[in-house]
């Protein structure tokens, strides 16, 4: 990879970051002001906080009034996946507004101290991996909302054909707000993953050179002074990599912790959506096979869309967290594969220090200090959801057969 493409990658990441900060400010989710060239780039702003407060109050009043009106008219049906999904996203959006205003000062300090672009300059990002990550992020932030908008349009054409399509955008907006911080969390982890991949490539290059220098033919070819000089240079580079790894671990933890509440709420929403989605599909089939009612194909299709989105959201997040953990374990494996038999003492010290750092921290994703988010945890959660679904289905079938 040449320096031109590496510079283009950094510019791309910087451009996407600026767009993200701009959208967060416009929608009232960032009550801080950005000032380029200052030591504290992000500073708490009372004007931005007032703007965010107006957003929060207006959003709560508009959508709270809608829920209250539907409750009075008896239109709330929590067995419907789309209705439950909408209510949950409205709730999460309000919580996001309030939580972001409470921690706005903390967020400003964290963002100001993160050496984000300095760290990017240290590493060359792989083109293929970066583009795949950006595509996945765009699928999550753009393709999923568009798919849900299509489902809303189909549902409105079926239930309220006289209403304007603007109403579907009104229903989609809470979903965008509720997922905004979650998408920021996802994007931050994508960047961390790419930096860890780049760091591992640097370690692999060192592994090849260190092991090559200690082969028998190479020991005879180079003088002891040359090897000592080369090992000292490699040790300096390894210390720099360890320093960058520590920065990644410390600052990403400080950034992800205040954002993790939104992620946990989003996971809860998706798990409830999966439960109701599967139950709605079963309910439609049971009505047809047992009660003899006509099968609601369009309603099942709409429920299937929301069910698929929830499954895809959890799958993407789980795989990303798993890739982060695998990348961290890969760093430890590379360090352990280094042959230190004829290495300089300075280099041995650098390797042992870096190994200790990696094995102790392990870069575990622990939202709010809770369980480590990985494939095992998600599989256990899915097992619990499946068990709960079986209980619901069994109870419904028992009631249906009693009525006959």
UniProtKB/Swiss-Prot annotation:
Keywords, sorted A to Z: Cell membrane, Membrane, Receptor, Transducer, Transmembrane, Transmembrane helix
Protein localization: Cell membrane
Pfam families: 7tm_7
InterPro entries for the chain: 7TM_chemorcpt (IPR013604)
Cytoplasmic domain ranges by topology: 1-11, 65-133, 193-260, 318-376
Annotated transmembrane regions: 12-32, 44-64, 134-154, 172-192, 261-281, 297-317, 377-397
Tissue expression as described in the entry: In larvae, is expressed in neurons of the terminal external chemosensory organ.
Highest taxon listed in the record's lineage: Eukaryota
Family listed: Belongs to the insect chemoreceptor superfamily. Gustatory receptor (GR) family. Gr22e subfamily.
Function description: Probable gustatory receptor which mediates acceptance or avoidance behavior, depending on its substrates.
Protein name according to UniProt: Putative gustatory receptor 94a
Gene label: Gr94a
């Amino acid at each position: 990879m040449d320096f031109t493409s590496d510079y283009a990658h950094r510019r791309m990441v910087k451009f996407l970051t600026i767009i993200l900060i701009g959208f967060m400010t416009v929608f009232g989710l960032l009550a801080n002001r950005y000032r380029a060239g200052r030591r504290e780039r992000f500073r708490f702003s009372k004007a931005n906080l007032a703007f965010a407060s107006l957003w929060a109050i207006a959003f709560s009043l508009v959508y709270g009034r809608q829920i209250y009106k539907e409750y009075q008219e008896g239109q709330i049906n929590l067995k419907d996946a789309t209705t439950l999904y909408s209510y949950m996203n409205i709730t999460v959006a309000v919580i996001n507004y309030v939580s972001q205003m409470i921690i706005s000062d903390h967020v400003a300090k964290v963002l100001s101290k993160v050496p984000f672009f300095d760290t990017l300059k240290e590493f060359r990002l792989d083109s293929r991996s970066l583009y795949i990550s950006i595509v996945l992020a765009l699928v999550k932030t753009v393709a999923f909302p568009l798919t849900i908008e299509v489902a809303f349009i189909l549902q409105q054409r079926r239930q309220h054909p006289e209403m304007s399509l603007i109403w579907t955008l009104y229903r989609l907006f809470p979903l965008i707000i509720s997922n905004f911080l979650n998408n920021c969390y996802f994007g931050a982890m994508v960047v961390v993953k790419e930096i860890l991949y780049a760091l591992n490539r640097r370690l692999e290059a060192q592994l090849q050179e260190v092991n090559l220098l200690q082969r028998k033919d190479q020991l005879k070819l180079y003088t002891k002074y040359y090897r000592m000089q080369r090992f000292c240079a490699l040790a300096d580079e390894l210390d720099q990599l360890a320093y960058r790894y520590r920065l990644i671990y410390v600052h990403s933890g400080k950034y992800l912790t205040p954002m993790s509440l939104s992620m946990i709420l989003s996971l809860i929403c998706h798990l409830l959506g999966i439960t109701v989605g599967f139950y709605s599909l079963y309910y439609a089939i049971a009505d047809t096979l047992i009660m003899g009612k006509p099968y609601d194909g369009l309603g099942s299709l709409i429920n299937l869309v929301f069910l698929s989105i929830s499954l895809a959201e959890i799958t993407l997040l789980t795989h990303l967290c798993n890739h982060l953990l695998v990348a961290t374990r890969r760093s430890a494996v590379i360090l352990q594969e280094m042959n230190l038999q004829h290495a300089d003492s300075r280099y041995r010290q650098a390797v042992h220090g870096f190994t200790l750092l990696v094995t102790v921290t392990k870069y575990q994703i622990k939202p709010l200090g809770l369980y480590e988010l990985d494939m095992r945890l998600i599989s256990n959660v899915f097992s619990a959801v499946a068990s709960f679904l079986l209980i619901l289905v069994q109870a419904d079938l028992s009631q249906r057969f009693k009525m006959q």
